Structure formats: structure tokens, C-alpha cells
Amino acid sequence: MLKVLVVDDEMLARDELKYLLERTKEVEIIGEADCVEDALEELMKNKPDIVFLDIQLSDDNGFEIANILKKMKNPPAIVFATAYDQYALQAFEVDALDYILKPFDEERIVQTLKKYKKQKQSQIEMKQEIKGADVTAEMHKLALPIEESIVLVNIEDIVYVGLVDGKVTVKTVRETYVTHDTLVILEKKLPQASFMRVHRSFIANINHITEIQPWFNSTYNLIMKEGSKVPVSRTYAKELKKLLRI
């Protein structure tokens, strides 16, 4: 259940919003407030996931609360729930999750909750990717799922990763592996300081490049230390030149 705080100086508006939120069966109303002072007290006490916040309050406006929330380490999501449409840009500037107008619509509120859950899932996935990349960098090895086992490969020995004959292939100085990982997954696992996508089907270790040969139509071939050729498409040629300062 999502924990929600409702802040509005009009009791009828609070009651309507609470009713619609509770109808979704996805939230728990953990508090309500009609002014900035009470809202901040509820925030510190209950730590909600989402704050539904009116802009015009009896003692100030909702942006005062939003600016305080923005400075918190793990702030709740802010949803402005207001009768005024002219503050949408200002809401964007304080990183509001959403901006909904009175009179409230149940379908619109459901959409807001879906948006929140999607955002949280994206944050979780990003943290997992960063954690995985950090572990890979610390180990200096890449874990490759190969058939029914996992092979640990020295990252510095990887020459390129590419789609060869329809299979995702990892070419090292001594071995060639076919893996169950996708190119997208491998690109996230490999350190960006050494590996660069040079083609929609290839990621190259720039430390293994010995020569760049012009090909046709502004494309290139990379000649790697152990003799492999890796294609560079026009899409990625400019970035490669920039990286290598050529």
C-alpha cells in the first residue's frame, strides 16, 4: 500500500480526494493537513510515499512545502492537486510527479498512481544496474552465462562484444564465447571508460584498437591487437573520433 498525505485548506476537497484515493484500494491515507505548519509536522511524523498538495493554502502556498521536500534525502513524490492551471511550469521546476486539476477525476488519479509506481520501478532497476556495474568494475571480471554454466572473463582481455551469425559473441584475446546475455545487458555491465558501442551490433574495447581503416560511405573498420576486424557504422564514427581525439 502506498502511504499518502493530503494537504488542502478546504475540507470538502480533502474529503473528495481521500475518497477517490481509497477507492483505488492501493493507498493508505496516513494523514491530512490544511496548512504548511501542520503539513510539515505530518511529513516528519509519518513519512509518506506521496503528498497530494494544494497550491493555495490558508497560511502560505504549496510551493513552500515542495521546496522543503526537495532538500530532503529521500523525499516523497509531490502531486499538485489544485484548481489553478497556471502553475504547471513552476511545479515542473520543483520536480513534481504530477499536476492534477480540480474537480478530481478518479481515472486521472489512477493514472497518477501508475506513474508513481512506474517511476519507482525505474529507480530500482537503475540502482540494480549501477550496483551490478560497480561489482563488475571491482572484480575486473565479467560473468558470462554460457550454456548451463557461468564463465568469469577478465574484462581487460575482452576485444569486442558483437552479434556474429545471429549470436551474441564475446571475443577475448584467447577465446571466443557465445553468451545468453544480450548486447544491451553487456553494454551496461562493461566499464564505459574502456568499451564503446561502435555499431548497432558491436561494442569494442578501445584499448585493443591498433588501427582505424576507412571503409566505404563514411564507415570504418577497427583493426584490433589480436587481428580481429570490428565494423564502425556512420552513426557511431563521430563519437569514436571524438573519444580518440582524431
Curated annotation (Swiss-Prot):
Q: Which residues carry this modification: 4-aspartylphosphate?
A: 54
The record, for PROSITE patterns, names: HTH_LYTTR, RESPONSE_REGULATORY
Q: What is this protein called?
A: Sensory transduction protein LytT
The GO molecular function terms of this record are: DNA binding; phosphorelay response regulator activity
Q: Which domain of life is it from?
A: Bacteria
> For this protein, what post-translational modification is recorded in UniProt?
Phosphorylated by LytS.
* Any single Gene Ontology cellular-component annotation: cytoplasm
Q: Which InterPro entries match?
A: CheY-like_superfamily, LytR-like, LytTR_DNA-bd_dom, Sig_transdc_resp-reg_receiver
The record, for SMART domains, names: LytTR, REC
Residue span(s) of domain Response regulatory: 3-117
Report the subcellular localization: Cytoplasm
Name the job this protein performs: Member of the two-component regulatory system LytS/LytT that probably regulates genes involved in cell wall metabolism.
- State the Pfam families in the record: LytTR, Response_reg
Keywords for this entry?
Cytoplasm, DNA-binding, Phosphoprotein, Transcription, Transcription regulation, Two-component regulatory system
Ranges for domain HTH LytTR-type come to: 142-246
Family matches, as Gene3D superfamilies: 2.20.25.10, 2.40.50.40, 3.40.50.2300
